[in-house]
Amino acid sequence: MIAIWKSDIMAKGLKKIGEDMKKKQKSIKINLIMNTIKTLMSLIFPLITFPYASRILGATGIGRVNYASSIVSYFSMFAALGISTYAVREGARIRDDKEKFSKFSREMLNINLCTTFIAYCALAVFLALPILENYKKLLVISSLSIIFTTIGTEWIFTIKEEYAYITKRAILFQIISLILLFVLVKNKNDYYWYAALTVISSGGSAFFNLWHSRKIVDWKQKKERLEYRKHLKPILMIFGTSVASSIYMTMDTTMLGAFRGDKATGVYTAAVKINTIVSTLIGTISATILPRVSYYLGNNLKKEYEKLMKESVDILFMIAIPAAIGMICTSDILILIFSGKEFLTGSTAAKILSA
C-alpha cells in the first residue's frame, strides 16, 4: 500500500512537472508571437510614415531631423548606460519575489535618473557650440526621448514577459503618431513636427508604463538601504561592450551631416531605414528569449537553456541569409518605392549595409 501511495505521489509530481514545462513552452511561443506582431507593426509603421515624410520634407528635411537625432543618440547612450540590458539579465532571476524585485527596480530607476541628469547637463553645454546654432530646436525636441526612455522602464515589462501589454501599447501610439503625421506634416517646413512625432510614441508609452508598473513594482521608498555600488561595475562593463556598437550605428550619420550636409544625410537615411527594417525583425528573436535565457541560467536549467539557444540560432540563420541576399538584389527598387527618385542614389549604400 505504501509503495502504491508513493508511486501515486511520484506520478502526480511528474505530471505537474510536465504540465509546468508545457506552460513554459506555450508562454515562450505566445511571447514570440506577440513580440513578432509588435515588430511587424514597427516595420509596417515606417513603411507608411517614411515614404510620406520623405516625399513631403524631401532629402534635406529628413536629413536635418536625422542629423539631430544622431547627435542626441550619444547622450541617450550615456543616459541608458547599459542599465536596461543589465536589468533584464539580473531582474529575471528574482522576478518571482516581489519584494526583492521592487527593491531592484527602485535601484535601477534611481541610477538611470542620475545618468539622465548628467546626460542633459552635457547636452546643454554641447548646445552652446556655434556649429549647432541651426539645429538647437531639433536637438531639444529629439532629446525628449532621453527622459521618456528612462521613466518608461521598459525593462520591467520585458523581465515579466508582458509582451501582450507591450504590443497593444506600441500599436496604440503608432496609430496616434500616424494620424498626427498626416494632420501636421503638410510641407517642407514641417520637419519640426516630424521630429516631435518621432518622440510622441516613446512619451506616451513612458506614462502608460509608469501607471501600469505600479501593479508590478512597489515604487514607495522603504527604510531598507538601497544598494547602488554593487550594480555599477557590471553596468559599466555592459556599457563598455555596447558603446562601440552604438557609436558604429550612429557615427556614420553624424559624420555625413557634419561634412556633407543635410541632403546627403537624408539620402543615406533612406538606405539605413530599409536596412533597419530587416535587422529589427532579426533582432526580435534575441530580445524575446533574453529574459527566459536569464531565468534558465538563474535556476540552473542547463538543458532548457541549450535547447532554446539551439532553436534560436537555427531561426536566425534561416531568416538572416535570405534577407541579406534579397536586400542586395532589390535595393534599387526598394529605395525608389520607399523614398522616391530624390533618394535613389542611396541604393549603393543600402547594398553595402545589407552585406
Could you tell me what each predicted segment is?
Residues F50-P51, A80-D96, A271, T276-V313, ...:
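Helix-loop junctions and terminal segments of transmembrane helices
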Residues Y52, G63-A80, M237, D252-T254, ...:
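Alpha-helical transmembrane segments of polytopic membrane transporters and translocases
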Residues I147-A170, S347, I352-A355:
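Membrane-interface junctions at transmembrane-helix termini in multi-pass inner-membrane proteins
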Residues Y67, S143, T167-K215, P234, ...:
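Hydrophobic alpha-helical transmembrane segments
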Residues I44-I62, V183-K188, S246-I277, P291-Y296, ...:
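Helix-terminus/linker motif at the lipid-water interface of multi-pass membrane proteins
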Residues I9-K24, I28, A164-T167, Y191-T198, ...:
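Interhelical loop/hinge segments that connect adjacent transmembrane helices in multipass membrane
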